[in-house]
Structures are given as C-alpha cells and as structure tokens.
C-alpha cells in the first residue's frame, strides 16, 4: 500500500494499554520544553531538537565520568557514526543537525589535537544572550 508521498504505510501494531504503575516504567530523554515553545528555536528542525536532547542525556554520563575541561566545563564525545545510529539517519543529515545546533549556539564543537571532536552542550536558560 502506498501513502500520499509514495512511502509504504506502516502496519498498525496490536499493543496493550498502560495499567496502574506501568506508566512509570520507562526512562526518558530530556527535551527542554523551551525548544518547542520559545520563538528563538522555532526554525530549528525537530530532528536537531531531538539530537540536543540526546546530547543532554550524554552530558549526565560525562559528569559521572569526570569529563570536564580546564575551565570546568562539561563536554561530551558523540561521533557522527553514533548520531547516525541513534537517530537512524544519513551522514549528511547528522552533519546538518550538528551544523544547525552550532549555528544557533546550542553547542560548540572543538577539535582537540587530532583527537575525536568534543562537544560542549550549551545552557540556553542560564541567562545568556537573547538570540
């Protein structure tokens, strides 16, 4: 069966309802509501917003691992290959999402002595410049 845009329609899954405490069984990625509601971020793609949420999740692991630079800023390592796998996207899409987040200032990416890139996930609610 073909949909409007020429893609095959997905088969509807036969799933159960949530009962009682089952609704609390999952862990979740953090996606700040402001990324959806704040006009500063209205032009960012939803995929890039999701990537930012994944980066926030990785940042908590970085804190536990002691990944801080000489200025005590926490950073993450997130390869293109991992982004592609996590979001089921092409290399071009992953690169474009990183560029989009970097262009608006949500992340900074630095190359350290030929090693893997490190990414600083920026805190947009800490009183920084209004975009």
Task: Map each language-model feature to its residues.
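Short, amphipathic alpha-helical interaction segments positioned at domain boundaries
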Residues: 125-131
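Intrinsic disorder/low-complexity segments enriched in polar/small residues
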Residues: 3-5, 103, 131
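Short recognition helix of helix-turn-helix/winged-helix DNA-binding domains
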Residues: 1-81
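Winged helix-turn-helix DNA-binding recognition segment
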Residues: 59-121
């Amino acid at each position: 069966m073909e949909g409007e845009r020429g893609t095959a329609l997905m088969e509807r899954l036969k799933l159960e309802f949530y009962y009682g405490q089952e609704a609390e069984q999952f862990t979740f990625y953090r996606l700040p509501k402001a990324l959806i509601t704040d006009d500063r971020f209205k032009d960012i793609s939803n995929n890039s917003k999701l990537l930012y949420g994944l980066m926030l999740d990785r940042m908590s692991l970085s804190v536990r691992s002691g990944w801080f630079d000489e200025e005590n800023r926490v950073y993450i390592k997130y390869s293109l290959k991992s982004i592609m796998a996590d979001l089921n996207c092409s290399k071009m899409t992953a690169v474009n999402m990183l560029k989009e987040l970097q262009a608006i200032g949500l992340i900074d990416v630095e190359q350290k002595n030929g090693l893997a890139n490190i990414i600083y996930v920026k805190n947009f609610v800490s009183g920084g410049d209004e975009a």
